[in-house]
Amino acid sequence: MNLHDLQNISENFQSTQRMPVLFLGHGSPMNAIEENQFVQGFRKAATEIPKPNAILCISAHWYTPGTFVTAMKMPKTIHDFYGFPKELFDVQYPAPGNPELAREAAELLLPAEVEEDHNWGLDHGAWSVIKHMYPEADIPVIQLSIDYTKPPQYHYDLAKKLHRLREKGILIIGSGNIVHNLRLIDWKNINTVGAGWDWAAEAREKTNNWLVDGNFQPIIDYQKQGTSLQYAVPTPDHYLPLMYTLGLKDQSEELALFNDELIGGSLSMTSVRIG
């Protein structure tokens, strides 16, 4: 692709006011079909920002060796879970894709190598939250995978290259959970909002303080921040989408938290809006 081709792609998205960026704590797949305070928070977030021209989602559930971007015209709805009710498997979110946006994102991320993908689709980290925000499924959605061979700092820096998409009305969403330790779930309080082990509460408080203070380096270097963060992030898959949201923040922009609750002992639903 040459610069002329990229210019033609870019012209498909009219310049508009800078779109905010979100990190959404997606929690259980059941949030896709339940009515609770968290899905209400997702809906409210959508009402507080301009309607996007398209959505680029970085989901915890597309965790790959290397970086890929969905480039099909009609991504399938992926039910990447098991042991849930049939009602959840019946959910379809038929949003269109956007191959042109996929190519532009890949071009912006150079010299990182980003391969176009035509097999993945929309996993539940994407559709389970976006369906509440935009139930009409009339906004194109693409996904960018997370390269699990790279450290948090790499993902934070990579995100900065996507900044110009914000100026074109593209909503960039990181979808995961800051505190996410499925092995230590408190099954007696699996649906109890506010239920959290002491270490989970400490990890949430630490990260919240760093977030609101704009002090992102300790968040990036979470492995150096003590026992509570080690328990909160036993594997980085659900944590790394936050790096993309934070990497897109301008110094002067405001950051706000919402859905800021622990649930089930070892999960946080804390979500972030920038801009």
Regions found by a protein language model. Name each.
Residues P20-L24, A54-S59, L144, L165-I178, ...:
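Beta-strand elements within well-structured catalytic alpha/beta cores of enzymes
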Residues I139-P140, K150, D157, H163-L171, ...:
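Surface-exposed, charge/polar-rich loops and edge strands
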Residues A60-T64, M74-P75, L122-I130, I178:
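Short glycine-enriched loops at secondary-structure junctions
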Residues T47-N53, L108-V114, P151, H163-I173, ...:
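Secondary-structure boundary elements
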Residues L88-P96, S145-P152, L229:
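Flexible, glycine/proline-enriched loop segments at strand-loop-helix junctions
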Residues L22-F23, D80-P85, Y134-I142, I220:
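Short, basic/glycine-rich phosphate-binding loops at helix/coil junctions
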Residues N2-A112:
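A short aromatic-anchored loop/beta-hairpin motif
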Residues A102-Y156, K161:
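Internal, conserved structured core segments that host functional sites
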